[in-house]
């Protein structure tokens, strides 16, 4: 696909004279364009749901969720991956973000990194990619060689693959087994795909990881019951989670958390089933960590 023919490289009539308007009008133009992004994502919800189901199946079987991207797309993958351990208590290696050019590229532009097919393949080799893993290639344009080569390599290994781009029929979309293509149109600043396209990608990644964690029992109701208390804010959040899930008071919630070494799931089952920490943990283990199953089946 030629660059000049891509939707993400098109000229946006709504912002054609944005350099001549007031600062407030400038903000309104950008905001009006941003409002279209959730609608574009809404149109591909069935594709996102299909990807979540596949990711969950693979991760449940011992696989990992691997994000692969360059520039903004790569940084968004790293952002999503890095938030999973503290939010959901998973091991850091379960959700992995890879960016063309390596760690240096997180904060700096690395010339030519996105054009390196070898880079995409080697980065996947270096993390020991296996057929159990799911590789999600992220590229607004859908033409990034680093991502395309990585997806091709992953498919050769037998991995399930997902391609996220904002141009229909792109190489990323056709290379991956599952395509998620929120078409957000031309950017306010022509070609600046960190804007609407980046926002769409972030929304999709939010759904992929959150959907995976919900289906993995990491959420009870709408509470993040595997949150790790790494700071005072999260310490308080744990107490509030136990309170909201059980109806107990703050003192009871804190006492239960202390008794089970600050594991929200165990504390919730302790309070709701009137159990000690050891028995609550045992029952959770018997039901794969799903609070709902412990409550419904016992």
Swiss-Prot record:
| UniProt-listed Enzyme Commission number(s) | 4.2.1.126
**Induction details:** Induced by MurNAc 6-phosphate that releases the repressor MurR from the DNA. Repressed by MurR in the absence of MurNAc 6-phosphate.
Catalysed reaction(s) here are: N-acetyl-D-muramate 6-phosphate + H2O = N-acetyl-D-glucosamine 6-phosphate + (R)-lactate
List, in alphabetical order, the GO biological process terms annotated in this UniProt record.
1,6-anhydro-N-acetyl-beta-muramic acid catabolic process; amino sugar catabolic process; N-acetylmuramic acid catabolic process; peptidoglycan turnover
Q: Active site at which residues? A: 83, 114
Q: What Gene3D superfamilies does the annotation carry?
A: 1.10.8.1080, Glucose-6-phosphate isomerase like protein, domain 1
InterPro entries, sorted: Etherase_MurQ, Glucokinase_regulatory_CS, MURQ/GCKR, SIS_dom, SIS_dom_sf
Pathway membership, UniProt: Amino-sugar metabolism; 1,6-anhydro-N-acetylmuramate degradation; Amino-sugar metabolism; N-acetylmuramate degradation; Cell wall biogenesis; peptidoglycan recycling
Q: Does the keyword Lyase apply?
A: yes
Enumerate the PROSITE patterns for this protein: GCKR, SIS
Q: Which Pfam families match?
A: GKRP_SIS_N
GO molecular function annotation = carbohydrate derivative binding; carbon-oxygen lyase activity; ether hydrolase activity
Record's keyword terms, sorted? Carbohydrate metabolism, Lyase
Q: Where is the SIS domain?
A: 55-218
Q: Which PANTHER family match?
A: GLUCOKINASE REGULATORY PROTEIN
Other known facts? A lyase-type mechanism (elimination/hydration) is suggested for the cleavage of the lactyl ether bond of MurNAc 6-phosphate, with the formation of an alpha,beta-unsaturated aldehyde intermediate with (E)-stereochemistry, followed by the syn addition of water to give product.
Quaternary data: Homodimer.
Its biological purpose is as follows:
Specifically catalyzes the cleavage of the D-lactyl ether substituent of MurNAc 6-phosphate, producing GlcNAc 6-phosphate and D-lactate. Together with AnmK, is also required for the utilization of anhydro-N-acetylmuramic acid (anhMurNAc) either imported from the medium or derived from its own cell wall murein, and thus plays a role in cell wall recycling.
Q: Which family does it belong to?
A: Belongs to the GCKR-like family. MurNAc-6-P etherase subfamily.
Protein's recorded name: N-acetylmuramic acid 6-phosphate etherase
């Amino acid at each position: 696909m030629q660059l000049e023919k891509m939707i993400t490289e098109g000229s946006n009539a709504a912002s054609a004279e944005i350099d001549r308007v007031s600062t407030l009008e400038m903000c309104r133009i950008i905001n009006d364009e941003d409002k279209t992004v959730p609608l574009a994502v809404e149109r591909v919800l069935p594709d996102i749901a299909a990807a979540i189901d596949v990711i969950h199946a693979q991760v449940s079987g011992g696989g990992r969720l691997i994000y692969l991207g360059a520039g903004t797309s790569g940084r968004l993958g790293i952002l999503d991956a890095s938030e999973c351990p503290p939010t959901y208590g998973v091991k850091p290696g379960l959700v992995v973000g890879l960016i063309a050019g390596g760690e240096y590229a997180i904060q700096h532009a690395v010339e030519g990194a996105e054009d390196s097919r070898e880079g995409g393949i080697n980065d996947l080799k270096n993390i020991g990619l296996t057929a159990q893993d799911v590789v999600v290639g992220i590229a607004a344009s859908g033409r990034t060689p680093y991502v395309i080569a990585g997806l091709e390599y992953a498919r050769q290994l037998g991995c399930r693959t997902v391609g996220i781009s904002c141009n229909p029929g792109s190489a990323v979309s056709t290379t991956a087994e599952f395509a998620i293509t929120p078409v957000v149109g031309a950017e306010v600043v022509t070609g600046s795909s960190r804007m609407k396209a980046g926002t769409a990608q972030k929304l999709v990644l939010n759904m992929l990881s959150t959907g995976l964690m919900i289906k993995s029992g990491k959420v009870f109701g709408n509470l993040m019951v595997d949150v790790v208390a790494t700071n005072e804010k999260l310490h308080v959040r744990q107490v509030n989670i136990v309170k909201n899930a059980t109806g107990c008071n703050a003192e009871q919630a804190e006492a239960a958390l202390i008794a089970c070494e600050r594991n929200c799931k165990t504390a919730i089952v302790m309070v709701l089933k009137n159990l000690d920490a050891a028995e609550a943990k045992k029952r959770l283990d018997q039901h794969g960590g799903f609070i709902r199953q412990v409550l419904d089946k016992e």
